[in-house]
């Protein structure tokens, strides 16, 4: 008498079809990211610069996420006017180039192209003349010292440049004084801890415990590259579905400066 055949998963079988499937065994999310993130970032940005399908996908995803801008509606007319005077001017941008809607688009583009973005809150003095004494600075993930991994004397730990306390809560980001790819030799490239409450770290969490983001298109980057090099004019089937919505750049808004806008 033979027993019933054991149920199996096709993905776990060993056969001719799976002979070339070399999957890593039980790696954690941060170990996987640490091994390949720098290379993935470089290749993603190369695609964004040189591949028309990649540029189209990035523009479409950004357009899908934020369009011409996500608006805030306040119940108070006075607060609405004050908010609008700040958010719809370059006062909001620490670099003085974009309004709030432009920053939304920039953040979305950084997340798509680089896997994540750091949003830094930069408080200002009331005497600086801004309608709201706060500016927003958008940083690429390269600013984080991902080579920094160690234990701290208070029972915490640092994983790829992000410091946690003994409870596993983020307390600091270890940042370089400038983008490591734009070294001007004005600074010593030694990372320093910055309080975590000054930042919003925007990225998609694919696995529990993941501390850094990875680009959403990393699984189809090779497909895109191969098809474009072979002369194919058809977009890769594995490209993110929202990339087929529109090839246009998100609609732009007029940017105005309101350094001395009325608060009344």
Predicted regions and their residues:
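Structured, contiguous alpha/beta core segments that scaffold functional sites
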Residues: 1-60, 69, 99-102, 108-264
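Low-complexity, highly charged intrinsically disordered N-terminal segments
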Residues: 62-91, 103-107
């Amino acid at each position: 008498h033979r027993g019933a055949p054991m149920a199996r998963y096709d993905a776990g079988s060993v056969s001719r079809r799976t002979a070339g499937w070399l999957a890593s065994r039980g790696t954690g999310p941060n170990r996987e990211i640490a091994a390949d993130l720098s290379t993935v970032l470089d290749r993603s940005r190369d695609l964004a610069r040189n591949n028309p399908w990649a540029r189209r996908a990035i523009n479409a995803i950004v357009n899908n996420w934020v369009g011409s801008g996500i608006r805030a509606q306040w119940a108070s007319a006075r607060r609405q006017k004050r908010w609008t005077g700040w958010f719809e001017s370059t006062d909001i941008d620490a670099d003085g180039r974009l309004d709030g809607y432009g920053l939304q688009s920039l953040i979305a583009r950084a997340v798509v192209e680089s896997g994540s973005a750091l949003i830094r809150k930069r408080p200002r003095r009331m005497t600086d003349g801004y309608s709201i004494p706060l500016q927003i600075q958008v940083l690429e993930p390269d600013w984080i010292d991902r080579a920094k991994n160690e234990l701290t004397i208070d029972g915490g730990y640092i994983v790829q440049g992000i410091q946690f306390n003994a409870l596993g809560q983020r307390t600091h980001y270890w940042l370089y004084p400038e983008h490591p790819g734009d070294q001007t030799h004005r600074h010593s490239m030694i990372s320093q801890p910055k309080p975590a409450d000054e930042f919003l770290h925007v990225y998609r969490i694919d696995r529990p415990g993941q501390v850094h983001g990875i680009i959403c298109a990393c699984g189809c980057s090779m497909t895109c590259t191969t098809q474009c090099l072979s002369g194919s004019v058809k977009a890769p089937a594995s490209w993110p579905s929202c990339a087929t919505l529109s090839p246009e750049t998100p609609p732009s808004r007029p940017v105005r400066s309101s350094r001395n806008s009325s608060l009344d």
